[in-house]
Amino acid sequence: MGGEKASGDSLALGPSFGFRSREFRAFFPFMPSVFLKTYGCQMNERDSEQVARSLMDRGYQRAESEKEADVILLNTCSVRDLAEQKALRKMMNLRALRKKNPEVVLGFLGCMAQRKGDSLAKEMKGLDLVVGTQKFHRVAELVDEARLARKEGRPRFLADVGEEEGSERTIRDHTLAPRQVTAFVSVMQGCDMHCSFCIVPTTRGKERSRPIGEIVEEVRSLVSQGVKEVTLLGQIVNMYGRRELPVVAGRTPFVQLLEELEKVEGLERLRFTSPHPRGMKADLIGCYGRLQKLCEHLHLPVQSGSDRMLKVMGRGYTADQYRRILAEVRQRCPGLGLTTDVIVGYPGETKEDYQATYRLLEEVEFDNAFIFRYSPREGTRAAKEKATAVPEEVKEERNQD
């Protein structure tokens, strides 16, 4: 969990693929338009960019608003219930557009689509499309099918939430805006950590990493288009390649990747998110102060300062181990900017557990901490702990403390 945004953002597309004036659309009324709204983390933003690119390559253009769109897609988040409820409410409101345009196509993409699948058709009457996290490369094809069905007066529900080998290698195209100097690059998909509170292994699948050479070529292409700063994305990004690639001369695959990107001419800054404390090995810590392009910033989710809660969460480290990691990185990089994620109100969290977290936050002096109230996610181990649930008013109090 990496500081995900609670609200959704509509995707801004560059002129080469998206924006067209009203005069242009009036002159070419046959060009279908699409409105794509994104909820959640940076990985969702990157996925939406890939979807937008595939739609633009197929002849779609960006709609200036939902009301003007022939196709409306919501790329969803499932990390917390609030994010799902926002997307569901949004879609319910969007259905009213059918009064003026009965042919408008409505679809869910991403994590909630993956988690709920076909059941969304029962929840949301009139839904055309549900596409999961391993099928983003099929969105344009399925949208075409849904539009044809609507136009012919025989609308039908289309869903694809299956697993697909190699899907991690399909998120590689970009739609850059004019003078855009930053970009996200997805290096892996999925997570095998199975923290007790987290739905990501269900919605994103098993860990799969892209080849180093393929990532380097993508970054070179971005730099050739004016990008100066790249952020590498992965659910546990610093564990990149541990299933597919060997450790070489004591260097883990992620460090090997960073070293190769350090060599890319024209790239000025390199970031990554979100790492896991268990992946902060000595070789990665050593990159701070050694690799000139690696930004002096680390977002490292701690989740709790209580050893008891960390064990229940299945995090695989203690509060002191976390402290030692930060001390080592700060020793290498004294000016390091440090941010984190914290969950309060986890099932069974006592006042003493919360105070341990509070003390850790005070001691470390993070530049920023994203504090989240625990949100039960169906299918996780923590969701079964109803007997030890923390009252909502206590969660809120700790969240606001």
Where are these regions (language model features)?
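Charged/polar low-complexity intrinsically disordered segments
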Residues: 4-5
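Aromatic (phenylalanine/tyrosine) cluster motif
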Residues: 17-19, 24-30
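Proteins enriched for Cys/Gly/acidic motifs involved in redox and nucleic-acid/cofactor modification
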Residues: 30-241, 253, 283, 288, ...
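Conserved strand-turn element in the central/C-terminal portion of the radical SAM core barrel
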Residues: 194, 198-205, 269-278, 304-314, ...
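Short glycine/threonine-rich loop-to-helix capping motif typified by GTGT followed
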Residues: 244-248, 285, 348-356
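Radical SAM/AdoMet-radical enzyme domain recognition
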Residues: 255, 263-264, 269, 281-340
